[in-house]
Amino acid sequence: MASSLQKQLKNIQSNNVLKINKIRRAPSLLYDPKVAADMDLEEIYVTAVSGFHELAVHEPRLLYFEKTLLGEQSVQVDRVLLNRTENEKIDLECVQILRLLAPFFTEKNALKVLEWLIRRFSIHEYVSDEFILSFLPFHDHPFFARILGCSKPKSRPLLFLENAIKMPVTLSRADIVHALSRDKEFFAMFAQFVQNTAESHNMYPELARFWAGTMMEVLVAWHSSNEDPNVLLDRFFLRVSYAVSYVSSIDFQIAGFMLLSSIAASLPLSPSIIPPLVSAITDRLSFDNIKPALICVGHLLQFCSSFEFDHEQLEKLESFGASSLLIELSQEHRLDEFFVSYWVSLIKSRKQKDKKRLISLLDTSISQIRVTHEQAKFLLSVIPVNQDFKALQSYRRILDSVIQPERKEGKLDNLINTLQDKKKSSTFSKKDREVLLKKISEIDSQTSFEQCLAYADSAADLDSSVFISLLSKFGDKIPFLLFCIANGSERIIILSLIELRKTIEENKDVDYQIILPVVLYSLQSKDTEVRSRALNLILTFLELRNENLEFSIIYGMDDNDNKNLRWLSPVETKYYCSDLLLDRSSEIGLDGTYLFSYIPERLFTEKKPKNASKEIAVTSFLSSHAACSKLSNVRVLLLEILTRVHGKVEDAKMQILLPRLEQLSEFNSEKFKTVSKREVEALVNCFNHTSFTSLLSFLSSNIVLSQAICRRIVEIQSHLKDPQRLEFVKAVISQDEQPHYYVDVLDSIKIPDTVFKKLIGSVRLVKEKNPAIAKRKRIDSHIFDGDVQRLTRILELLETKNAASYPKLASPLFEVLNSVIALKEDIVSSNYLLQLLLGLLYEMIGASPITELSPSIRIDTLVGCIRSTNNPQIQNKALLLVSALANAAPEAVLHGVMPIFTFMGSTVLSRDDAFSIHVIEQTVKTVISALIRLGKDFDSSLLVSCFVNAFPHIPQHRRLRLYRLVLQTIGSNRFLSVVLIQFAEKMLLAKSTNVVAIHDFCLTLVQSFSVADRIGSINQCSRFCLKSLEEQSNSDSNGKAVSLIKLDELPMDVDLATLGSLRVKVLELISLVSKAKNFAFDLAKIMENSVDSFVEIQAGLFESIKLLITLSQQSSNEMELGHVYVALRSVIHLLPNELFCTVLGKLLHDERALLRRKALSIVQQRVQQGSKVSALTALIPDVTYNISNYSDEETTQLAMDCLAVMAKRFSASPELFISPIEVVSGPYGLKNSARDVQVSAIVCITVLTNTLAARILPYLADIVNYSLSILDDARKDPEGDLLELACFSMMIDFFKVLPEFSSSYVEPTIKCALASDRAFEHDAIGELLFETIANFIPTRLLMKSIFAAWPECARLGSTAALRLLELIELALQNSSRSAIGTVYKSIFKFFLDSFDSRRSLLFAEDVDNVETQAVNVFLKFVMKLSDTTFRPLFLHLHSWALEDLYETDPSGIVSRQTFFYNFLTIFLDTLKSIVTNYYAYVLDDTIELLSSKDTNSEVRHLVNSSLVSAFENDTEEFWMVPARFGKISPVLIEQIQYAPLLDDKVLVKAIVELASVASSSDNFRSMNTQLLQYLRSSNINARLLAIQIQTQLYGRLGENWISTLPQSVPFIAELMEDDDDQVETATAELVRIIDDRLGENESLQDYLT
């Protein structure tokens, strides 16, 4: 449990921003990381919820998270404590809410919610990839840099963001495109993210556009780098086609259309793939995606000529108005192929009567789209000649544009022949003119300029004379011409400028200066000709002005609409036209935007008004037109120019424009729609800081105007004075509604502390004392609420401005704090106000020292605030403020220390959030540190008890940091032991689970401090135990009735009855502390690095050991004494090796056996677990000393166990153990009468054998002989299993270590093992023994011992024989051929003896198993021999089995024959064709045995079996030799006569295998002739067996044996008439087999008839 806690705490420590001695920082989007670290989570939560609900109005799906991520219970969530499943669930919800928040990223409400998700759920860590990708479309937004600053990406593709994260800075689009094109994994990751977003129905336009744009740029980058087009198609096509077909997200689908268009333009698409794509797009058309879809289809069809739409596609396109949309879209996109294919398909698909309507529609369409000559010809070809050709007037333009170039080259297209003559062409123009003139003739005074402008566009396309006819409809054409210039196309503007010039020239006595601002508008046109015509018009105007300096009429002056216009004098007009414009005609002609910088530059002047009359006049003139012109475009242009006009002329400009601003402020929402946002912003930007009051007066008007004014005030704030800033801030915060741009402008405006002080002072929070007044106040409570609201907004504003930079506001804020606390019950939002105030004061007081303490700053106010509220956030912030005050002015908080700590122990310590812990830490560090600095005495043990008492309530993962902080503050060298002692006191009454928790925590706590502190705590705890024992003894000896005593380490008196239990708990903690991980290592490190430090630590350790030993001498309680010894052992383990040996050497000679045993255990553990323990060899004599007649059995065993461990560890120094082996193998060890001591001695000798090796030889004989005698006795003892096991183990090690010297003990060891019933049971020590003997003992010596043990097997039985044969098998496996070659004769002789078991009647009950095992092992032996070596042995075996006993023991020879043929069968089956020829040696004997009627039936059966194996494994035609076949065949077939006594299957198989291996017609005939005789045998069994053999022969040999059929037919016919049912059934089966082999064309019946 402790290790788990440590791991958890380490994890929290690594992730916690509140690290000791480190500036706290917290990831944040809205605040500086330092400020965010001290912010209250509750406050962030409240802010997030408010923003969340505002967002939910626009995105209702967010309400799902109202009870999860934004629920009240989320404040208590700590992801570190959640399990994997719970964290994965939160991750999934975080991803979902991120996708919903992404479209609102630029809104502050979304940032508030994100701030909460970052601070509470760490989305920047847990779902970092989704966090970054969700807001990647806003990569150039300033807040995206904060997104990166918070993020900790985990995926490799996002590691390219590392530099941007470190800075942090925003990303350029080029950076992202570069990363996408460079890293294909990032490309796939981002594409999948976009797809997932679409599938979750969270796609939004910014993401779709960003994805499409970046993908197109990546496509261009890859294409330009000569990537294989097919590879690029593979990367893009699947994702793009998915987007195109995804109808659930229009934005995603439109982005797919854009990408597909790019792919079609960049990569070669197969013509076969375009029709399916077009079909897929048209199937998914909607009113939302129709235009992008048509553009995409158009791009696809540019690469697929002669495409035809089917009927369904045409119907769908028509339903969306594709005809008119194609015309509209063709103005910006090339859609000629689409247009032609669409119209051709449309005309072909319609009936005759519909085609006329379509052609008429085409008439109005084709004139507005450009097609090539070939396309025009193809389009005309689908129209029948007999159609109404006059309806195709629109083709005139096409024919002119397409055919004319070919005429110049002398190439006339066939399309010309479709035109009848020029006369018809001219009729088309007349027709068009007539239609348009008719429309123009219908114009009246009610016709709008916009409609007339449309006619003007048509007239410009047909003929300029028609345009003149249109102008004639106006009595005064000047207004319409000006309207055309301001709103028409380039062609209309040019015609209008021409006509305007004519009008001026015709009316030379009229001053047309009213046209100058409109002409100025045309000078910024992108069209060069327009700008040239405009300059010519100005030149003409100037020339006429020069001719006639005095005009009788100024055009427009009498018009009431122009009453507010300013007019230019002749001189001013000349200045405007010549100096201002014509002087820079070349620049203006080249660049239309030149006006915006040049005119303001020329109008700028610092002259006095009387010397700048022309500049002022022109400025007034332009300003009046900017305010009063009826042409919106002209107004906007003039305002944008005037925005840049500065100097002395600004007063004139603002004087004229101010009424326009007032007019706009009075517009209602409907009327305001007639004014563009661009015009409003341009108008407001014309005002500077001198008009601040005027601008401020319009702040509460229309939202567009108000927003523009706010933005302008931010821009001019550097020129504002403090009163103006105060006035502006007051105006903003006093508004009932607070739109989002108010927040932005207040964030951007700089507010000095004097302004804040006046703002705070302007709010009066005073409760009326007069009841009548108070009653009226309640009736009119909104006044009081308004003050609270303004105060809240002021404080929120101050919070965003970094309150630490306003230290002078601390005093007024404390006064406000006092007022809020006093009126807490009367203010609804008092908690929120208190949090704001406390947080601001904490930042201010913590930022700078307090030189003079204001009377308003009182600690009792804060203490009362802390104790009077249940709100944890207020309590935490108040404590932080107390901490800051303690640091800045410690004397101010001195008298409030104990109430604060009492409060903390009962409430704050139980909270489980980072902010509360931060509060506690700050309070402890600052308050206690301040008291220490003041030198005040206070009861630190009482302070410690506050925290110890609160231990169960403190969250587990928060405890370590808190207690470390307390101890570091008050002094860990003194009070670490006090904490441990007080925890020990708490364990007395705690539950077992709580005791374990305290144990684990104490261990973790102690490990976190230095080695010196740990040793000091052990020393002080030991001294406490000894002191308490002495106090207890003194109270008992005095005889006084004392039940309680006072100890300095505890804040309360201790009951004498529990004092002993308390010491036991303290001793447990001492042991626990001493066993802490790496304690000894840390000590050794200090010893290496600092000798002086180690001397002090060593002294402390000696002191602790001395105290514990003294305690063990004085204590009389056995349980307490046991804990003393445990603690003593733990402390001793901390000693370095040299000191360890000194101390333990004394303890090993102590008179107390218990203490010696403890010392032996300590030594053993140190040797096993320690490092660099060579110095411990000095203790070998001391350990050996404990193996003596004076020691009890337990001590002797422990000493030998310890000696064994030391022998293993110090095996490199065997000379040290020569003396101990003599003691161990002597009367106190091996020869001890106690069985347990013997076992320990044997185990110790086993280990010493490995260490000493040959050095043990002087003692070997004595040890082994005595051990074998012990082994023999143990075998007979029912409880001697452990001793038996130990002896065998020791012998195994002897055989391993000294194989040459221990060979003489192999035979008795084998005999003992074979005789043991337990050796081969569960532990299998016997098998291990035999494996060791087989592996290590030389073959020659081993075989000798085995042969000598064989007679013992005859006595012990078959089980022993089988185990010995297994040992031989192991020996044969581990022996080389050469080793076997030296003893093979003796081995063969042994096997002959073992093979004779059947004759000698050994193992009668299990002789078959023994014989089989012997044969198998013998075959292993044979495999080790060469053929040359084995053949003589085989002949010897043959003569031994079949000849040696022929005369001396006729009955015994049968047993050997039985063995021999059993062996021969296994031998042939094992070695197969390699040894088939060995049968030549036994063929005659085999024939003789088979021929003899006296042969044993079992032998006869085994002989037949051997023949089967011999026949089956013949691959060299051994049995084809006539001499062998002639011998064996008759004898083998004669065995049929022994049918009842034989295994029929073996005989049948032998005869069939012989026929198969000796296949020839002569052999078949010979065998068949002999077999046929038995078909007529009087013995039914013989006849049946012969029939079975014939059946098997026909079945096995088939057609080969059919050759004997004619010879067999008479016999078969007789058999078919046999009276015996069995014979008849067998014959029927034979006939069936013969018929099967004869086939369909023949039958046995043919031979029988």
UniProtKB/Swiss-Prot annotation:
It comes from the Eukaryota. GO terms for cellular component: 90S preribosome; preribosome, small subunit precursor; small-subunit processome; t-UTP complex. Coiled coil: none annotated. Its main location: nucleus. GO terms for molecular function: snoRNA binding. HEAT repeats lie at residues 1608-1646. The keyword NADP does not apply. It is found in: Nucleus, Nucleolus. It holds the Pfam family HEAT_HEATR1. The keyword RNA-binding does not apply. SUPFAM superfamilies: ARM repeat. GO terms for biological process: maturation of SSU-rRNA from tricistronic rRNA transcript (SSU-rRNA, 5.8S rRNA, LSU-rRNA); positive regulation of transcription by RNA polymerase I. Keywords: Nucleus, Ribonucleoprotein, Ribosome biogenesis, rRNA processing, Transcription. Belongs to the HEATR1/UTP10 family. Component of the ribosomal small subunit (SSU) processome. Involved in nucleolar processing of pre-18S ribosomal RNA. Required for optimal pre-ribosomal RNA transcription by RNA polymerase I together with a subset of U3 proteins required for transcription (t-UTPs). Involved in ribosome biosynthesis. This is U3 small nucleolar RNA-associated protein 10. It comes from Schizosaccharomyces pombe (strain 972 / ATCC 24843). The gene is utp10.
